[in-house]
From Swiss-Prot:
Pfam families: DEP (PF00610)
Modified residues (Phosphotyrosine): Y289
Cellular component terms per the entry's GO annotation: lysosomal membrane
Subunit structure: Associated component of the mechanistic target of rapamycin complex 1 (mTORC1) which contains MTOR, MLST8 and RPTOR. Associated component of the mechanistic target of rapamycin complex 2 (mTORC2) which contains MTOR, MLST8, PROTOR1, RICTOR, MAPKAP1 and DEPTOR. Interacts (via PDZ domain) with MTOR; interacts with MTOR within both mTORC1 and mTORC2. Interacts (via PDZ domain) with MINAR1 (via N-terminus). Interacts with SIK3.
Protein's name according to its UniProt entry: DEP domain-containing mTOR-interacting protein
Cysteines joined through disulfide linkages: none
Residues recorded with modification Phosphoserine: 235, 244, 258, 263, 265, 280, 282-283, 286-287, 291, 293, 297-299
Residues in PDZ domain copies: 330-407
Renumbered ranges of motif DDEX motif: 217-235
Domain DEP, chain residue ranges per copy: 36-119, 146-219
Region listing for Disordered, in residue ranges: 1-23
MF annotations from Gene Ontology: phosphatidic acid binding; protein kinase inhibitor activity; protein serine/threonine kinase inhibitor activity
Main location: membrane
Length: 409
C-alpha cells in the first residue's frame, strides 16, 4: 500500500502520527497478511501439500502437516531455517488464518500435527475489516476485467496519475454492476472502502465525494508476496515497487519515460483457472470436467478449454426479456473437501460448462447450459467467468447461486 502522493498534505496526513495513523497502518498490515496467507494457501493446494489426511481411522479434509510444511517452506526458499518458518506460520495463526484441526494447540509447532487454513473449513472469521477488504479485492478484480475501462491514466491539478477512477463514474458503475441498488448506497460503500484504507484520493487531499475527483486503490492485490515479509514490521508500502498499479506516484508528462504500469510481467501475472474446485491441478478429461485452483506459479497453468456446451450465444438482455423461455433456479452449494464441483465459462453471461456428477453442485441440482445470474446475492450477469470464479474462490464455503435455465435445454 502507499501512504499517499507527495502532492500536498491532505486531511488524512494530519492524523498520520495519531490514533488514525496507527489504525490505518494496522488495517494495511492486516490486508497484507490476508493476501500473503491466501497466496500461500493456493500454492499449497496446487502442490498437494494441502490434502485429505487420515489419523486413527478419521479423515481430516484439506490439511497440511506442520513438519512437512516447514520442510516445504525451506525447500522453496520461503524461510531460511526452521525457526523462521515457525515464526512465519505463527503470524498466520495469530491472525486467524490457520489453526490446528482440533484447536488443541494455539502455537504452531514443528511436529507431525495437522493444521488447516480456516478458509478451507468455513471457520474464517468475517469481521467488518475482513469483509471490507474482500469486497475491495473483488471490486478490483472486476475493474481489471478486459471489458471494463474505468481505470485510466488521468490528470488532476496538473499531475498525471495512473489507474485512476473518477468518483461519479465509479458510482455509476457500482449501480450498473449490481454492487449497489442506489447511488446513495454506492456512495456509502465507497466511504467504507475509504475508511478501511482500500481506496483514497490520488493526492490524499479529499474524502470520497460524488464528483470529478480522482481516486485509486491503495493496495496491489496481485503483487506476489514473499512469506518473509510477514516478519517485516515496517509499513507494507515500503515493499511496493514503482511498477505497482496502486503506487500513488506522480507520473511524468513525457510519455517516453512512462512505465507500462504492470505489477509483474504478463508471463508471471497471477492466473486464475476457473474450474471452481479447490484441489490441485489435473488434466482435462474427455468429459470436459477438470479440477483446479488458481495458480500463482510463474509458469503458465494448464488450461483446459473444451468446446462450449451452449447451442448458441446468449446475451444478458435476452435472458431478461419478458416472456423469454428461461426458468430461474436457486441453489445452495456447500463445498466438500475439494471444492464445489463445476466449471464456469463465457462472459456476459457466464454459463455452467461442466458439472462433476459426484460433486456438491450436482447434488444441489446444477446442470450444464445454465446461466449464472448471481453469486451470494451479487449480480454477475455482466462479468466474465474469471470474475465469477474469483468471487466464489474468495468467498465462504457455502455459496448461494441463482441461475437461469433454458426450458428445452
Amino acid at each position: 500500500m502507499e501512504e499517499g502522493s507527495s502532492g500536498g498534505s491532505g486531511s488524512s496526513d494530519s492524523n498520520a502520527g495519531g490514533s488514525g495513523g496507527v489504525q490505518q497502518r494496522e488495517l494495511e498490515r492486516m490486508a497484507e497478511v490476508l493476501v500473503t496467507g491466501e497466496q500461500l494457501r493456493l500454492r499449497l493446494h496446487e502442490e498437494k501439500v494441502i490434502k485429505d489426511r487420515r489419523h486413527h481411522l478419521k479423515t481430516y479434509p484439506n490439511c497440511f502437516v506442520a513438519k512437512e510444511l516447514i520442510d516445504w517452506l525451506i525447500e522453496h526458499k520461503e524461510a531460511s531455517d526452521r525457526e523462521t518458518a515457525i515464526k512465519l506460520m505463527q503470524k498466520l495463526a495469530d491472525r486467524g488464518i490457520i489453526h490446528h484441526v482440533c484447536d488443541e494447540h494455539k502455537e504452531f509447532k514443528d511436529v507431525k500435527l495437522f493444521y488447516r487454513f480456516r478458509k478451507d473449513d468455513g471457520t474464517f472469521a468475517l469481521d467488518s475489516e475482513v469483509k471490507a477488504f474482500m469486497r475491495g479485492q473483488r471490486l478490483y478484480e472486476k475493474l481489471m476485467s478486459p471489458e471494463t475501462t474505468l481505470l485510466q491514466p488521468r490528470e488532476e491539478e496538473g499531475v498525471k496519475y495512473e489507474r485512476t477512477f473518477m468518483a461519479s463514474e465509479f458510482l455509476d458503475w457500482l449501480v450498473q454492476e449490481g454492487e449497489a441498488t442506489t447511488r446513495k448506497e454506492a456512495e456509502q460503500l465507497c466511504h467504507r472502502l475509504m475508511d478501511h484504507g482500500i481506496i483514497q484520493h490520488v493526492s490524499n487531499k479529499h474524502p470520497f465525494v460524488d464528483s470529478n475527483l480522482l481516486y485509486q486503490f491503495r493496495m496491489n492485490f496481485r503483487r506476489r508476496r514473499r512469506l518473509m515479509e510477514l516478519l517485516n514490521e515496517t509499513s507494507p508500502s515500503s515493499q511496493e515497487t514503482h511498477d505497482s498499479p496502486f503506487c500513488l506516484r506522480k507520473q511524468s508528462h513525457d510519455s517516453r519515460k512512462s512505465t507500462s504500469f504492470m505489477s509483474v510481467s504478463p508471463s508471471k501475472e497471477i492466473k486464475i483457472v476457473s474450474a471452481v474446485r479447490r484441489s490441485s491441478m489435473s488434466s482435462c478429461g474427455s468429459s470436459g470436467y477438470f479440477s483446479s485452483s488458481p495458480t500463482l506459479s510463474s509458469s503458465p497453468p494448464v488450461l483446459c478449454n473444451p468446446k462450449s456446451v451452449l447451442k448458441r450465444p446468449v446475451t444478458s438482455e435476452e435472458l431478461l426479456t419478458p416472456g423469454a423461455p428461461y426458468a430461474r433456479k436457486t441453489f445452495t452449494i456447500v463445498g466438500d473437501a475439494v471444492g464445489w464441483g463445476f466449471v464456469v465459462r463465457g462472459s456476459k453471461p457466464c454459463h455452467i460448462q461442466a458439472v462433476d456428477p459426484s460433486g456438491p453442485a450436482a447434488a444441489a441440482g446444477m446442470k450444464v447450459c445454465q446461466f449464472v445470474v448471481s453469486v451470494n446475492g451479487l449480480n454477475v450477469l455482466n462479468v466474465d467467468y474469471r470474475t465469477v470464479s474469483n468471487l466464489i474462490l474468495t468467498g465462504p464455503r457455502t455459496i448461494v447461486m441463482e441461475v437461469m435455465e433454458e426450458l428445452d435445454c
